Amino acid sequence: MAASQLAALEGEELGAGEPALTKASPAVLYSEGQRLALEALLSSGEETFWACVQQERLPPFLSADEAQALATAAEDWLVPSQEPGAAGTGTAITDGDVGSLTYWPRQSEEPAPLLRLGWPEDTAWKGITRAQLYTQPPGEGQPPIKELVHQEIQAARKLVAVVMDVFTDPDLLRDMVDAATRRWIPVYLLLDHQHLPAFLALAQQLGVNLWTTENLDIRTVQGHTFQSRRRRQVSGHVREKFVLLDGDRVISGSYSFTWSDSRLHRSLVTLLTGEIADAFNQEFRVLYAASRPLSAAPARSPLFSPPEGPQLPRSPHRVALRCPVAPVAPLLSDGPLAQRLAACHILERDKQETPTTTGPALSDILRSVQRTRTTSGPPTRPSRSLWDLSRLSQLSGSSDGENESKKFWVSKDTPARALMRQRGTGGGPRAEMDSRSQPWGGPLPSIPARRLRYLSPAQRRLGDNATTSDWASGSGSGRRR
């Protein structure tokens, strides 16, 4: 057997004088020269960085744009203060606070935070892993990626968990708010910390309050952080993009929730179902443990300030300008007499400049409408009853002036009273009959009163030539006999 074969069986490789590069070798993932060059970049700038690269004889592991971006994003290394009254503040680290560069007990020993809105626990087998590819622009017979995400969010019933770098699509934000508030589904959203201002501006323009919306948990997450010995640090971005739905479906790919990705950029996503969803479930929990909640809601000014969005048009009606509360007079200061007199003078001038003519009040408008309806309506039709005739005569005589209205209503002669006198039931003095013209004709003539006579059947047959007297006279003559 050849020596090379024996070396292969024994695990030895050719070139035993040089160490082999394996995945476990530190030289693959770590370079002391790159660390020194990066510290020079964060502390002194790009020129010092390129000088260190040449001195250490390193290949150009950073492009010019990447080096410029890292130098711009560098910041001081701050640690949160542990004092009770200084929660959430940051202080510069000192030499005694420098911990181990290879071991972080706080990141490895602290328990992961609980999911605030809950998480569906489903231990059942989810089936075989299946994958379906979608592209943008869409392929033949496939929906656009934005439509796919919209349909899957609408179909969710237990959970919507999103990890995204850039989120500026208003339609997808409305879908998530609708799922959280109307269908009562827990919605988690982890965003890259450097692109959070764009998302907050979108929510403000849509009128969505991210701090008070129920079933909506929004947090920020960042990449790994490099901290130099000179108390400078730089953090990376979140490049993961996936949507976990109900714990059994995942949409993952290069698509971002922006208008440019839905219309201009080329991207692709994969719809995964089955057991692979458990891996994304675990990854989301890890990211949630490393995330941070949103800062406190911005405090409102004590004075009213109109929103920055489009204003509603003002009403052209003058009624809208009325104030139900009387304007408050300015308080007089306790200063010299000249200042108080000046304040009184300003108050009187404002009262004089205030226009006294205002628009018609609501009661005036209603009164004019009722008057118009009364005059333009059909005339009252007279009735045959005595009560209606009396009311009609009173209404007809109520518009002849103030002198006529002062007369007492009993002294007026009405058609109803004339009819009652004709029937022999009285009705007031005939001398006070009103000679005013009635709406239906002239005044009724006065009929003299006469005695009623009872006619027997024989007299009614013979007529007026009958010689028999009436029953009153006959009964009287009989009594005289």
UniProtKB/Swiss-Prot annotation:
Annotated compartments: Cytoplasm; Cytoplasm, Perinuclear region
Record function comment: May play a role in MAPK signaling.
Bias (Low complexity) ranges: 371-385
Pfam families: SACK1
Cysteines paired by S-S bonds: none
Feature: compositional bias, Polar residues: 391-400, 465-474
Keyword annotations: Cytoplasm
Domain notes: All members of the FAM83 family of proteins share a conserved N-terminal DUF1669 (domain of unknown function 1669) domain of about 300 amino acids. This domain mediates the interaction with casein kinase 1 (CK1) isoforms. Therefore, it has been proposed to rename DUF1669 the polypeptide anchor of CK1 domain.
Database matches in InterPro entries: FAM83, SACK1
Subunit composition and interactions: Directly interacts (via DUF1669) with CSNK1A1, CSNK1A1L, CSNK1D and CSNK1E. May interact with RAF1.
Main localization, broad class: cytoplasm
Family the UniProt entry places it in: Belongs to the FAM83 family.
Stored PANTHER family: PROTEIN FAM83A-RELATED (PTHR16181:SF29)
Gene Ontology terms, MF aspect: protein kinase binding
Name recorded for this polypeptide: Protein FAM83E
Species for this entry: Mus musculus
Residue segments, region Disordered: 351-481
Region of interest called DUF1669, as start-end residue ranges on this chain: 1-296
Coiled coil location: none
